[in-house]
A protein has these predicted regions:
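Noncatalytic alpha-helical scaffold of FAD-dependent oxidoreductases
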Residues: 1-475
Length: 475
């Protein structure tokens, strides 16, 4: 098997040394470790096809990995059989931007392209790719599509699904499905690409994508706003929608405990307020038109909220440098939490109108059942995505006889609160291996049944990232 793989990808495309493999089989937060026969790094779609066909013939699972920035262990290789550990398939060497078309606003790229590199290529083409998140320096396009990533710009541009115009996918038997025409109109039946977006590598391996670029918005305005409560933040968002709805590019709510951790651990962070507010909102407006007075609009809306008593303080950025510093605070959340302790990150989505009561209900449950934890909130308020983070100290975590059942118990407690509001337990992070039981427990039974049938149709041997998304017995 190893020699056959070497014959496909060459020596530099195959890693078998256990020490060198370690970063590929362990999640980035060092919480879960898998095993694999080898790490395979193809350099082309044809090589991916040959690798997958070989694995299908040998009955070996294929575990795709992108930038390994996920939070649900979807890239950790875990086989259900000792005799078939499977291979990790990394598309790191497939990092070519194949084409950018300014006329159509389409960039065609390899799946291993890093998000930050795509941002730069889009700017060079006079456009922008509007997906932004804290891991954009390492997250890869294939993984972002496979998890239908969200980020801070969903309120204006939608999640990754809305930015994908076409895909190239290697199926479980090695055949290549090519759908990169990126036509605006195409009514020729099922749009199969949507099955692979958010499938977390369980139906095939994404090797290329046609992505929608957007006009640049060089005219921007940014502010950190101290609000009295989540309800006040919701009211501020509604007022901003009325006045400048088409300009809103981000509206991020952060709780005081989370702000404090960023201040404690983030390097080079400069904070806008002398004291940490109970709740604060990072707002970004953007326009293609340089004449639109965005700072004035922002000051008008925030000023009215200040008069209503919903806002305590606000700082509007007066330079690009200050705006960058604002975003540095927001994008430092994950690393700050990693340094602080063990955070159980909930990825809830509810209707925007339910954000405030959900946060209150979740905080009440957390305080009653888990007093050892500090409850933190980071919320993409514009799209209703609430990250409740229960932060436990490492000393407490070390006393647990078994971490996984406890973590699942905590997650279920908050998931049940979300369910009462008609929300979902996975807004943008995916399901991975971490939440397969929760998907089976909370999903509509018919929807879940149909998902298992789709999996069986595309991957009858269950070799594509087995154990991810669907519970093993269901797949």
């Amino acid at each position: 098997m190893l020699e056959a793989l070497r014959g496909i990808v060459g020596n530099k495309g195959l890693i078998t040394d256990p020490t060198e493999m370690e970063p590929w089989i362990t999640d980035w937060r060092q919480r879960r470790r898998g095993r694999a026969l080898a790490v395979v790094q193809p350099a082309s779609t044809q090589e991916v096809s040959a690798v997958v066909a070989l694995c299908a013939a040998e009955g070996q699972p294929v575990f795709p990995v992108g930038g390994n920035t996920g939070l649900c262990f979807g890239a950790v290789p875990e086989s259900d059989r000792q005799d078939r550990p499977g291979v990790v398939l990394s598309l790191r060497r497939m990092n070519r931007i194949r084409a950018t078309d300014r006329a159509t606003g389409i960039a065609t790229v390899d799946a291993g392209v890093v998000l930050g590199d795509l941002h730069n290529a889009a700017i060079e083409a006079g456009r922008q790719f509007p997906l932004h998140l804290g891991s954009e320096g390492s997250a890869q396009i294939g993984g972002l599509i496979s998890t239908n990533a969200g980020g801070t710009g969903v309120v204006r541009y939608g999640p990754m699904r809305d930015l994908v115009a076409g895909l190239e996918v290697v199926l479980a038997d090695g055949r290549v499905l090519t759908d990169l025409a990126a036509l605006r109109k195409d009514n020729t039946g099922y749009m199969l690409r949507h099955l692979f977006i958010g499938a977390e590598g369980t139906l095939g391996i994404i090797t290329g994508a046609a992505l929608r670029l957007h006009p640049q918005t060089p005219n921007t305005a940014h502010a950190w706003v101290s609000v009295i409560s989540p309800a006040a933040a919701v009211a501020l968002f509604a007022a901003l929608q009325d006045r400048a709805g088409s300009y809103i590019q981000a509206f991020e709510l952060v709780s005081a405990p989370q702000f404090e951790l960023v201040r404690r651990h983030a390097e080079r962070a400069r904070f806008p307020f002398p004291e940490i507010p109970a709740w604060s909102v990072l707002i970004e407006l953007g326009s293609e038109d340089a004449t639109t007075a965005l700072p004035a609009i922002l000051e008008e809306v925030v000023g009215a909220a200040l008069e209503r008593g919903e806002v305590r303080d606000a700082v509007v950025a007066t330079s690009e440098q200050q705006a960058s510093e604002f975003w540095h605070i927001r994008h430092s959340v994950s690393e700050a939490n990693k340094k602080e302790g063990i955070g159980i990150v909930l990825d809830i989505a509810v209707r925007s109108s339910d954000v405030a009561p959900f946060i209150a209900a979740a905080a009440a449950v957390a305080a009653e059942r888990y007093p050892q934890a500090v409850s933190q909130v980071v919320c993409h308020l514009g799209d209703g995505n609430v990250h409740v983070i229960l932060m436990f100290q490492r000393d407490f975590w070390a006393t647990l006889p078994d971490e996984d059942p406890f973590a699942l118990e905590v997650e279920r407690a908050i998931h049940d609160v979300a369910a009462r509001f008609g929300g979902t337990f996975s807004a943008e992070h995916g399901v991975g291996r971490k939440l397969t039981e929760e998907l089976e427990r909370l999903a509509d039974p018919l929807r879940y049944e149909l998902m298992t049938k789709v999996k069986a149709l595309f991957d009858p041997q269950n070799l594509m990232n087995p154990g991810v998304l669907l519970a093993p017995k269901a797949a």
